[in-house]
């Protein structure tokens, strides 16, 4: 029976191995016994073994994080080994050095260091002890050259020359009452600023002449010629009391035809075409069934269409034998030959809408060209102040060498979409040629750039330069030329600036 019982137990429990529940129970009893012997308590609230395991895992994890962080920081900010770095800077003092052969030379600026090495490298930061371990040479480079190179060449190049006439709301910056501001970038046209269109105009004076500024150009006008003033909606006082214009704005604005009584060739002579209603110089008026009357002028070999305002000017001039227009029916006018001999583009279609300079003391000449276009756009902006956003006004830089004569810029501002690597182009809207290359700093200085592949690559100026009219660039103070020959120069001392300005330190 006992043997039979053992057989039954063997068939029911297999080999009699321990189950998982028995093993975990045994381990629990062992840990409880160890805790009873070591801590004199059997409540399993804290297990020392598990705490030790967690401590080891946490320590290993922290060590790995520290090692990975150190590795990453070594790439971001290396410890500073000179090795073969061509341009070196002292990590503590920031002093700049250029490496030529086995000798370090103190460099005046980054432009000089790049031109000497021929590479557009940034300074490699090292410890001063490493710099002291190498032989040194004298000071090298171009005095006054820039150290900041972040070239920008937008698709649309935009430049402005602005005059701000001193008044109750503007502080006079110039003894002549005009502040000249150069703006590189897109103007801000909010805040009652407007682009002059149609009959909009500004009347300013330069020297002894008065000028009507509209449609991107200036036209001279005589304050004593009432036959022209009245149709234009101007008074002699508006012209004689016009506020001054700077030489910079005067040069930037292309000159247009003078606003005078149009000079008619062979005035008073007999017209040579059949059916002429009168001699040369006769003003013709043609009634229309719908719309305003049409005016024309009899010339030697035909008739030229006149704007009503020009017809009024000719009538005001009181030419002999032509005191009033001659009425010609449309059917008769249609048989007369049409010519276009007189340039009447300076005259508006309607009386001028003159901007009040007291409310709009700022006048800007705006030059703009987009890449791929054959012509530039020239417009005039008028407003209460220069076209700079209010929150950007603190970025307008007052130039140290502002001459306050209106021949150079007094202020400069780099606005949105500014260009700092430019090629000079002509002032003519159709100009396609590009000449010298220039690098501009946000302090308002311009530096000529040697037009060679080596110099441009060394300075990191590989992009295509934006066009910029010379009439604007010449208003900025000029710095030295950035060339390799000028950079390969040693100095014991540097010349002193003979016309510095005092730095005012707030108390």
Curated annotation (Swiss-Prot):
Q: Which InterPro entries match?
A: T7SS_EccB (IPR007795), T7SS_EccB_R1 (IPR044857), T7SS_EccB_R3 (IPR042485)
What sections of the protein cross the membrane?
56-76
A GO molecular function assigned to this protein is: ATP binding
Q: Which Pfam families match?
A: T7SS_ESX1_EccB (PF05108)
User: Where in or outside the cell is it found?
Assistant: Cell inner membrane
One GO CC term on file: plasma membrane
Highest taxon above the source species: Bacteria
Report the Gene3D superfamilies cross-referenced here. Type VII secretion system EccB, repeat 1 domain, Type VII secretion system EccB, repeat 3 domain
Q: How does it sit in the membrane?
A: Single-pass membrane protein
The EC code for this enzyme is: 3.6.-.-
Entry keyword set: ATP-binding, Cell inner membrane, Cell membrane, Hydrolase, Membrane, Nucleotide-binding, Transmembrane, Transmembrane helix, Transport
The subunit field of the Swiss-Prot or TrEMBL record says: Part of the ESX-5 / type VII secretion system (T7SS), which is composed of cytosolic and membrane components. The ESX-5 membrane complex is composed of EccB5, EccC5, EccD5 and EccE5.
Protein family (similarity comment): Belongs to the EccB family.
Q: State the function annotated in the UniProt record.
A: An ATPase. Part of the ESX-5 specialized secretion system, which is responsible for the secretion of EsxN and a number of PE_PGRS and PPE proteins.
Query: Could you tell me what this protein is called?
Result: ESX-5 secretion system ATPase EccB5
Give the organism the record lists. Answer: Mycobacterium marinum (strain ATCC BAA-535 / M)
* Taxon lineage: Bacteria, Bacillati, Actinomycetota, Actinomycetes, Mycobacteriales
Gene (UniProt): eccB5
């Amino acid at each position: 029976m006992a043997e039979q019982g053992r057989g039954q137990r063997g068939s029911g429990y297999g080999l009699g191995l321990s189950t998982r529940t028995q093993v975990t129970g045994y381990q629990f009893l062992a840990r409880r016994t160890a805790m009873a012997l070591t801590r004199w308590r059997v409540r399993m609230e804290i297990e020392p073994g598990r705490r030790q395991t967690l401590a080891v895992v946490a320590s290993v994890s922290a060590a790995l994080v520290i090692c990975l962080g150190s590795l990453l920081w070594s790439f971001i900010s290396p410890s500073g080994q000179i090795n073969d770095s061509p341009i070196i800077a002292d990590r503590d003092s920031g002093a700049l050095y250029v490496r030529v052969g086995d000798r370090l030379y103190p460099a005046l600026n980054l432009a000089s260091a790049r031109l000497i090495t021929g590479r557009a490298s940034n300074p490699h930061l090292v410890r001063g002890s490493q710099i002291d371990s190498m032989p040194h040479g004298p000071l090298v480079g171009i005095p006054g050259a820039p150290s900041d190179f972040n070239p920008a060449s937008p698709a649309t190049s935009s430049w402005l020359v602005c005059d701000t006439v001193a008044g109750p709301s503007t502080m006079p910056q110039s003894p002549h009452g005009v502040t000249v501001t150069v703006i590189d970038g897109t103007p801000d046209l909010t805040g009652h600023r407007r682009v002059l269109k149609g009959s909009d105009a500004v009347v300013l004076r330069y020297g002894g002449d008065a000028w009507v500024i509209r449609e991107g150009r200036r036209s001279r006008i005589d304050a004593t010629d009432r036959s022209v003033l009245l149709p234009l909606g101007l008074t002699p006082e508006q012209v004689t009391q016009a506020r001054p214009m700077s030489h910079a704005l005067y040069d930037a604005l292309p000159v247009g035809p003078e606003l005078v009584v149009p000079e008619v060739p062979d005035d008073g002579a007999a017209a040579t075409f059949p059916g002429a209603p009168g001699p040369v110089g006769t003003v013709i008026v043609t009634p229309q069934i719908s719309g305003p009357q049409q005016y024309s002028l009899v010339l030697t070999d035909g008739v030229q269409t006149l704007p009503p305002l020009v017809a009024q000017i000719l009538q005001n001039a009181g030419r002999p034998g032509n005191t009033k227009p001659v009425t010609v029916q449309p059917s008769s006018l249609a048989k007369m030959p049409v010519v276009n001999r007189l340039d009447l583009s300076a005259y508006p279609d309607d009386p001028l809408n003159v901007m009040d300079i007291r409310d709009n003391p700022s006048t800007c000449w705006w030059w703009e060209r987009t890449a791929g276009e054959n012509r530039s756009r020239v417009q005039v902006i008028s407003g209460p102040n220069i076209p700079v956003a209010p929150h950007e006004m603190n970025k307008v830089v007052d130039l140290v060498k502002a001459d306050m004569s209106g021949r150079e810029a007094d202020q400069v501002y780099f606005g949105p979409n500014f260009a700092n690597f430019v090629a000079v182009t002509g002032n003519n809207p159709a100009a396609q040629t590009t000449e010298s290359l220039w690098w501009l700093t946000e302090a308002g200085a311009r530096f000529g750039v040697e037009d060679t592949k080596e110099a441009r690559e060394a300075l990191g100026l590989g992009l295509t330069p934006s066009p910029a009219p010379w009439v604007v660039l010449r208003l900025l103070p000029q710095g030295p030329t950035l060339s390799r020959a000028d950079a390969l120069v040693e100095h014991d001392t540097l010349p002193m600036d003979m016309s510095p300005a005092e730095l005012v330190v707030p108390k």
